[in-house]
């Protein structure tokens, strides 16, 4: 019997387009013999959730601007309220796969709605998603857990920061300015003088009202690990990968990631001494646990080639990209876990976590929702 899977994609975020690409790869990785996939597109401008036609095997979802609006019903056990020419209630979905990047999708908002709906979903819950999304909060939690982080300052509406102040506090003239709640390097700038700094702040404030100002780590190597939590709760860490940006870009920004096909080289596995790779992988697992993550995450670290102790946890991404150049699926593929098996593992974790929540009274069993919604038999054709 195939499981009914809702694939959430799009979203009201600057990473909307990246989500669409990721969703196509996730859809193709879901075994059609095991899963019946129904995409739900989230409009970038309005935030409306719209039901898409079920996918044929190998088909990628496409953004739709018309069609029925939908919402998961609180206490509905995975049922959708469908508002088209008439109103109806869908048959329940067994699991939701959110392929959403950035605010309004990766930050705990959607996860909270899915918890209220009583439906299993892939990835971290509300706390882990929200904590990892806010880079300031994440760094505080990791620092409190004894993890090494790059020194930084926070700027915002009530806290202005001048370039001279940042240089003195962070002991570096070269700084990174970035929105606290954004991914895919959107809004990130590298600066080395006051003019660049002011421009970078204005650019970052276009995406968020909280801004991080970080000390640059000269010639830092960016090492990434894919973390996967099994259905039994075991936290597994992949071999390391390395991002080597092209010299023309200077750092791994949005253009290097998604615009320039030669913007960076992905080195899998990264060339690290075994002991160093093990140490950095251990830090990745600790970061995953410090932020209360679940299911999956990509953990990015910096390695200072001039300092044997220069290892820093940069950030934790709880819904990493699944594009053709995304490190998370590539790392697991290189470790022998192909995308279809990876998706099987993620869905198994989602179902097992939800079952544990039911067993401890933190979620209602599907049977309770079935009984409550039995009078409403009208459903959409899927």
Curated annotation (Swiss-Prot):
GO BP annotations, alphabetical order: cell wall organization; peptidoglycan biosynthetic process; regulation of cell shape
Subcellular location: Cytoplasm
Cofactor: Mg(2+); Mn(2+)
Residues binding Mg(2+) 1, per UniProt: 300, 315
Entry-linked Gene3D superfamilies: 3.40.50.20, ATP-grasp fold, A domain, ATP-grasp fold, B domain
Domain ATP-grasp span(s) in chain numbering: 139-348
Sequence positions that bind ATP: 168-223
InterPro entries noted in UniProt: ATP-grasp, ATP_grasp_subdomain_1, D-Ala_lig_Van_CS, D_ala_D_ala, Dala_Dala_lig_C, Dala_Dala_lig_N, PreATP-grasp_dom_sf
Highest taxon in the source lineage: Bacteria
Cellular component aspect of the GO annotation: cytosol
Annotated cofactor note: Binds 2 magnesium or manganese ions per subunit.
Recorded catalytic activity of this chain's protein: 2 D-alanine + ATP = D-alanyl-D-alanine + ADP + phosphate + H(+)
Keywords: ATP-binding, Cell shape, Cell wall biogenesis/degradation, Cytoplasm, Ligase, Magnesium, Manganese, Metal-binding, Nucleotide-binding, Peptidoglycan synthesis
Enzyme Commission no: 6.3.2.4
Binding locations of Mg(2+) 2: 315, 317
Keyword check for Metal-binding: yes
A GO molecular-function annotation: metal ion binding
One Pfam family in the UniProt entry: Dala_Dala_lig_N
Enzyme class: ligase
Pathway noted in the entry: Cell wall biogenesis; peptidoglycan biosynthesis
Keyword Manganese: yes
Family, similarity comment: Belongs to the D-alanine--D-alanine ligase family.
Function summary: Cell wall formation.
HAMAP family: Dala_Dala_lig (MF_00047)
Protein known as: D-alanine--D-alanine ligase
Source organism of the structure: Methylobacterium sp. (strain 4-46)
Gene: ddl
